[in-house]
UniProtKB/Swiss-Prot annotation:
InterPro entries: L-lactate/malate_DH (IPR001557), Lactate/malate_DH_C (IPR022383), Lactate/malate_DH_N (IPR001236), Lactate_DH/Glyco_Ohase_4_C (IPR015955), Malate_DH_AS (IPR001252), Malate_DH_NAD-dep_euk (IPR011274), Malate_DH_type2 (IPR010945), NAD(P)-bd_dom_sf (IPR036291). The keyword Lipoprotein does not apply. Substrate binds at residues 149, 155, 188, 219. The lineage of its organism: Eukaryota, Amoebozoa, Evosea, Eumycetozoa, Dictyostelia. Catalyzes the reversible oxidation of malate to oxaloacetate. This is Probable malate dehydrogenase 1. It comes from Dictyostelium discoideum (Social amoeba).
Length: 391
């Protein structure tokens, strides 16, 4: 196991010396991204619509759509958005909340609670069951609502129902939303639902669409922090490759831990854990099956943790990732890492000015590649099934 420890420069918060990862090509000059610090609330990194300064007198509010708005995830999410956790403490928002007609009364209750919180950043709430009203001029769309898989339901039947839902929402994005709208799909199967919406929003850039794998990344980083015995905030750059499903590929080979084993030091995750058997035989299945484990324990799917992941995904996308860090987002493949073009696939990305860029040049070992091939196969099969219904 390669040992590599660097000391942090306390003045600049940047790391000195060579990159510790052989998989990054060796020295600092070849590393595909810098290791180091950086601040999230930096106007030079933020999307043009987001205000991160203290002057909010004439700031235009961001219109944020949340679908499935009367559901559990949305209930946790919208209070986080309204309180400034997604766009920062200086950016006002207008919430557009959409749900199906039978949830209209519950939606009214959610609106009352939002009003009762008296959030300074929440300018207004548009709660509706009408898709045109919901999607009109929105800047950010968080598509949480989807048809859940019931007992005995075949995956192709689930895809058929959700293709219908996300076809309609893709068409609504194309027709009513702002041309620069940023779209995050959460409802499962998220990758293929995102692809369906993207294909029906043909006037919008493919780079405006993404699906959520941040929850998987957060789960993985939490497990690593617990295994090593450090704060989760010290664990960085764990990658989730592929589908948001049980074929997802958690990859720690490019991750590092700050202030480990002592303050002021940094060490790669594999040598910090120092247990290849655990990483390969226990850690990966634990991450892959965490959602099912939560359901088994609480008889409900993840809600608060999903909302937290949504906030982190959008915040990093629109405010920018920190220097030396990448995050996992399922985005439209451009062929990187031999992933076929035309899939929504989770990659490591960095974000700047509201645009994501896939991190290039990472070496992938044979074991990880085999798992990536399996998740590619699953996504191709999902796409083929979804397209048969779409067409």
């Amino acid at each position: 196991m390669e040992q590599a420890i660097l000391r942090i420069n306390n003045i600049s918060s940047q790391l000195t010396g060579k990159c510790p990862f052989k998989a990054h090509g060796g020295g600092a000059g070849k590393c595909p991204y810098k290791l180091g610090g950086g601040q999230i609330l930096d106007q030079s990194k933020a999307w043009s619509l987001v205000n991160v300064t203290a002057n909010v007198d004439q700031v235009t509010p961001i219109k944020v759509l949340v679908t499935g708005a009367a559901g559990q995830i949305a209930y946790s999410l919208m209070f986080m958005i309204a309180s400034g956790q997604m766009f920062g403490p200086h950016q006002p928002v207008i919430l557009h909340l959409l749900d199906i007609p039978k949830m209209a009364d519950a939606l009214k209750g959610v609106v009352m609670e939002l009003q009762d919180c008296s959030y300074p950043l929440l300018q207004s709430v548009v709660a509706t069951t009408d898709i045109q009203t919901a999607f009109l001029h929105i800047n950010v769309a968080i598509l949480v609502g989807a048809f859940p898989r019931g007992p005995g339901m075949q995956r192709k039947d689930l895809l058929k129902v959700n293709v219908s839902i996300f076809k309609e929402q893709g068409e609504a994005l194309n027709k009513y939303a702002s041309r620069g709208v940023k779209v995050l799909v959460v409802g499962n199967p998220a990758n293929t639902n995102a692809l369906t919406a993207l294909m029906k929003a043909s006037d919008l850039p493919t780079s405006n669409f993404s699906a959520l794998t941040r929850l998987d990344q957060n789960r993985a980083q939490s497990m690593i922090s617990e295994k090593v015995g450090t704060n989760v905030d010290n664990v960085h750059n764990v990658i989730i490759w592929g589908n948001h499903s049980q074929t997802q590929v958690p990859d720690v080979n490019h991750g590092y831990i700050l202030n480990y084993p002592n303050r002021g030091l940094i060490e790669p995750i594999p040598s910090s854990v120092n247990d290849d058997k655990w990483l390969n035989e226990q850690f990966i299945p634990l991450v892959q099956n965490r959602g099912a484990t939560v359901i088994a324990a609480r008889k409900l799917s993840s809600a608060a943790s999903a909302a937290n992941a949504i906030v982190g995904h959008v915040r990093d996308w629109l405010l920018g990732t920190k220097d030396g860090e990448h995050v996992s987002m399922a985005v439209y493949s451009d062929g990187s890492y031999n992933v076929p073009k035309g899939l929504i696939f989770s990659f490591p990305v960095t974000c700047h000015n509201g645009q994501w860029t896939i991190v290039q040049g990472l070496k992938i070992n044979s074991s990880t590649q085999q798992k990536i091939d399996a998740t590619i196969k699953e996504l191709q099969e999902e796409k083929e099934t979804a397209m048969s219904f779409l067409n």
